[in-house]
């Protein structure tokens, strides 16, 4: 009987203890923000997809269609970091658009013109935002 009473007392003591929950707080509420692409980042993603389709059409001997006018937004799209929209970028953007326009106007040398457009992308990305270079290189037609 003494053992039962002792057991009840021990269980009772442990069950009545309050457990405090520790909350980690830095004093500031953190607000989760979803990443939103800048206009330029979204445009470049679209250009990449468009160029993947053009590459496949060239490899299959199909026509490539007309110059995509939305490529011209490269001159006006807002950047993630507006300081990237400098003279160097403007020169490289012009070279890229010229290469693309030549691709769509000269159907005899599409492979060479397409690869020249890829070159223009890489030359710019070597100096600005180098992350996608390996991905861009996959566009080359061998």
Predicted region positions:
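Sec-dependent signal peptide recognition
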Residues: 2-7
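Short, linear, compositionally biased motifs with a strong N-terminal bias
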Residues: 10-11
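C-terminal motif of bacterial Sec signal peptides marking the signal peptidase cleavage site
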Residues: 14-15
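Extracytoplasmic c-type cytochrome modules immediately beyond a signal peptide or single-pass transmembrane anchor
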Residues: 19-117, 133-142
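The canonical Cys-X-X-Cys-His
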Residues: 117-129
């Amino acid at each position: 009987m003494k053992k039962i009473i002792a057991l009840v007392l021990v269980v009772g003591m442990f069950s009545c203890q309050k457990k405090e929950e520790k909350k980690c707080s830095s004093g500031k509420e953190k607000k989760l923000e979803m990443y939103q692409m800048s206009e330029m980042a979204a445009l470049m993603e679209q250009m990449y997809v468009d160029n993947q389709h053009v590459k496949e059409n060239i490899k299959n001997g199909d026509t490539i269609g007309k110059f995509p006018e939305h490529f011209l937004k490269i001159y006006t799209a807002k950047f993630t970091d507006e300081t990237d929209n400098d003279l160097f970028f403007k020169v490289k953007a012009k070279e890229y658009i010229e290469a693309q326009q030549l691709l769509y106007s000269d159907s005899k040398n599409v492979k060479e013109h397409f690869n020249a457009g890829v070159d223009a992308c890489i030359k710019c990305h070597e100096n600005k935002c180098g992350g996608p270079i390996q991905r861009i290189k996959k566009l080359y037609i061998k």
